[in-house]
Amino acid sequence: MRSFLKPLLTIAAMALGMAAVVPMPAWALVELNVNKGNVEPLPIAITDFQGGDALGAQISQIVTADLKRSGLFAPIDKSAFIEKITNPDAAPRFDDWKVINAQALVTGSVSKEADGRIRAQYRLWDTFAGQQMAGEQFFANDANQRRVAHIIADAIYERLTGEKGYFDTRVVFIDESGAKNARKKRLAIMDQDGANVRYLSDGRSIVLTPRFSPNRQEITYMSYESGQPRVYLLQIETGQRELVGNFPGMTFAPRFSPDGQKVIMSLLRDDGNSNIFAMDLRSRSTTRLTNSTAIDTSPSYSPDGSKVVFTSDRGGRAQIYVMGADGSGQTRISFGDGVYSTPVWSPRGDLIAFTKQTGGEFQIGVMKTDGSGERILSSGFQQEGPTWAPNGRVLMFFRDSNGGPKLVSVDLTGRNEQPIPTSNFASDPAWSPLLE
Amino acid sequence: MGRIAALTRNPVMIALVAMLAIAGCASKKTPNNAADLGLNGAGAATPGSAQDFTVNIGDRIFFDTDSSSIRADAQTTLARQAQWLNQYKQYAIVVEGHADERGTREYNLALGARRAAAARDFLVSKGVASSRLKTISYGKERPVAVCDDISCWSQNRRAVTTLSGAGS
């Protein structure tokens, strides 16, 4: 089992036997359809996990917060609960939950093992069908308490929506502090809900645009530490850094290929224009993908690695283009009224997220990969830089207001916008794949 | 308001006021204008000094939105810079390109680079040796003016000619 951090190796899951013998129907209680009008969030009761002193309540709280923020669930206030769960392994009194309109019920327990690990288990009940829908248990060390809760939230989300969750993930971003004309920028990493912030650079040089490797262990980013702005690789755990390529000019706007073997980025030409190159991290060979007397930047691979979407102002103002991963067939796909930049291909492959400037506003939107079906999800005075949750259902971006940038997430309906809590200003979020 | 109206009749005064306004917003870390260098105005600088360049020649030019074309007023400034740089050849030169915040981060890095290159190319066309010139883009990461409107954005869309190497 691969892991993101060494201590996480101890997370192990196993299915819990069904308390009800009826075979589980494979339908989802929540339908995900971005084109539908109002998605009615599913009323769900999440009881405090039994045992573990405060830990049981804390796990329940994290699961509740994750599900609530997704916009697909409406956790019911605990004060409305009628049945007090004393044995989380026994079938609950379904009528007590139906009467408060809890369509789904979560029970669980947490305990300390003799070896110091935590054992957490949950059961998900369909109150109207009167049966268990899912049940699993996990072992983890103390440092991973929050991860256990996120993994349980992912399991519930997946069982009830039919889609993978995105709660057991991290975000790398730029922590910003100080006055606007003397901003200190630091690389930082945190859980997707804003917990467990850790700094990866000291703030002495400007750092920008961190992006996750598909293996979750590395990030690529841009730094001014050598004087000349360049793209670097950073091993998150060891702190080991290296320059990506040895080019004469500025390198910027890096992203990994989906197999993690390449970094694609912009390289400044001597004439002041920027072209897109891909560098193979093992052979160190570089391939030029564009060769225009224009700004070509913000490249992002399709999840199958066969195509690249990027920004170019070759047509006058910045627009979105798609090309083959070898640079072939460069085609403009954005034709709306405005300036388009920072395209990012969805991990599902179906959509491209972008930043659009029009009418004095900055918008975050999505379009199909041929440029059709543009939908604006969020508009504001200054906001940019979308990144996809690994399930392709939620975007995170940064919005500058009240003196500095903060992180915000929005789902594909555009109706569920959520602030991501950070203690300082924050920009350039990049969402990790699901942890392992 | 009356005072501003009076000033607008005198172009020289406008230039001075604009320069002081910019100086007031500048980062203290990069002394590239009169206020940062502890000077109160033109005339105090030794000819051939960095202060002389900043105060009497003008170290920066400004650009239109999303453009790297050298405007007529910028051409005048750059021509003056070139003349001075050709006289005082002991300096190495770094041209910084900057963008306002009304663009995305990566695009603005590219735009700043293009502005720096345009200013550099103009200086070269006026006889400054290209071997003395380097460029760097800061995109929108180093604004000198920090308000949220046009008056600030126009000051941030700039190329700044900075002197290094041997100096007095």
Curated annotation (Swiss-Prot), chain B:
Pfam family, one: OmpA
KW Cell division (keyword) present: yes
SUPFAM superfamilies xrefs: OmpA-like (SSF103088)
Record keywords, A-Z: Cell cycle, Cell division, Cell outer membrane, Lipoprotein, Membrane, Palmitate, Signal
Membrane topology listed for this record: Lipid-anchor
Lipid attachment site numbers (N-palmitoyl cysteine): C25
InterPro entries per UniProt: Bact_OuterMem_StrucFunc, OMP_bac, OmpA-like, OMPA-like_CS, OmpA-like_sf, Pal, Pal_lipo_C
Main location: membrane
Residue span, OmpA-like domain: 50-167
Gene Ontology cellular-component annotations: cell outer membrane
Domain of life, source organism: Bacteria
Residue pairs linked by disulfide bridges in the UniProt entry: none
Signal peptide, first to last residue: 1-24
Lipidated residue numbers (S-diacylglycerol cysteine): C25
Protein location: Cell outer membrane
GO biological process, one term: cell division
Role of this protein: Part of the Tol-Pal system, which plays a role in outer membrane invagination during cell division and is important for maintaining outer membrane integrity.
UniProt record similarity statement: Belongs to the Pal lipoprotein family.
HAMAP family linked to this entry: Pal
Quaternary structure annotation from Swiss-Prot or TrEMBL: The Tol-Pal system is composed of five core proteins: the inner membrane proteins TolA, TolQ and TolR, the periplasmic protein TolB and the outer membrane protein Pal. They form a network linking the inner and outer membranes and the peptidoglycan layer.
Protein name: Peptidoglycan-associated lipoprotein
Protein source organism: Mesorhizobium japonicum (strain LMG 29417 / CECT 9101 / MAFF 303099) (Mesorhizobium loti (strain MAFF 303099))
Lineage: Bacteria, Pseudomonadati, Pseudomonadota, Alphaproteobacteria, Hyphomicrobiales
